Amino acid sequence: MIKWPWKAQEITQNEDWPWDDALAIPLLVNLTAQEQARLIALAERFLQQKRLVALQGFELDSLKSARIALIFCLPILELGIEWLDGFHEVLIYPAPFVVDDEWEDDIGLVHSQRVVQSGQSWQQGPIILNWLDIQDSFDASGFNLIIHEVAHKLDMRNGDRASGIPFIPLRDVAGWEHDLHAAMNNIQDEIDLVGESAASIDAYAATDPAECFAVLSEYFFSAPELFAPRFPALWQRFCQFYRQDPSQRLRVSADEGDYGEESEH
């Protein structure tokens, strides 16, 4: 059980969100104009349905709120806003936060410890984030705190807790589980060889299936070039689940860039 020291400031609704400025981040640059329009429509609904709550003196403005909403809606661009029905609030700290964590061990003893967290996603509760890591999520780097926590929420739709297997057809579960565990083992092998700091995929992905799904969801949207060629079978499963192919967006964007350079000569 985690105790939260809430001192909150809620963002007020704004009918004039700065969408053009909000879209101007590397994470979203490869979306087509049609995809951007649909993402904005989802983000507007997100801001109508969810409360963004600033904690510990952090101040939200329209641009910050719009960018947060756009990133929340990127994973469900083709799934629909109803896939985010499992929570009503997004709590935002200014930086990674300390919480009091209590747990009971196998013999019934209760332990307490202060833990530093970047974010949290609860089955029947809010998503908790921090602004420093949200800012780092704007880049196309493989790290994205918002997508990580959204992936946990999507994962939880398949049961009482995150398992690494989202809500997919039953016939696909065994194959998904096989490919996910194969990826975890591959990532762990790389960690054993070069160490956590030098691994090309965040070592957190090797800790358990739920974290592997969440971490690889970050790479799926923000660094597909690191995910797709390394785990092609699992990549295809992610494409089928999210109904998106970010690597295709990347190729199209690169081709358009090459064409533009040729046209200038």
UniProtKB/Swiss-Prot annotation:
Its cofactor is Zn(2+). GO terms for molecular function: aminopeptidase activity; metallopeptidase activity; zinc ion binding. Its main location: cytoplasm. It is found in: Cytoplasm. Binds 1 zinc ion per subunit. InterPro entries: MetalloPept_cat_dom_sf, MtfA_enterob, MtfA_fam, MtfA_N. Keywords: Aminopeptidase, Cytoplasm, Hydrolase, Metal-binding, Metalloprotease, Protease, Zinc. One of its GO terms (biological process) is proteolysis. It is an enzyme of class 3 (hydrolase). Zn(2+) binds at residues 111, 148, 152, 211. Its EC number is 3.4.11.-. The keyword Lyase does not apply. GO terms for cellular component: cytosol. It holds the Pfam family Peptidase_M90. Interacts with Mlc. PANTHER family: MTFA PEPTIDASE, PROTEIN MTFA. Involved in the modulation of the activity of the glucose-phosphotransferase system (glucose-PTS). Interacts with the transcriptional repressor Mlc, preventing its interaction with DNA and leading to the modulation of expression of genes regulated by Mlc, including ptsG, which encodes the PTS system glucose-specific EIICB component. Belongs to the MtfA family. This is Mlc titration factor A.
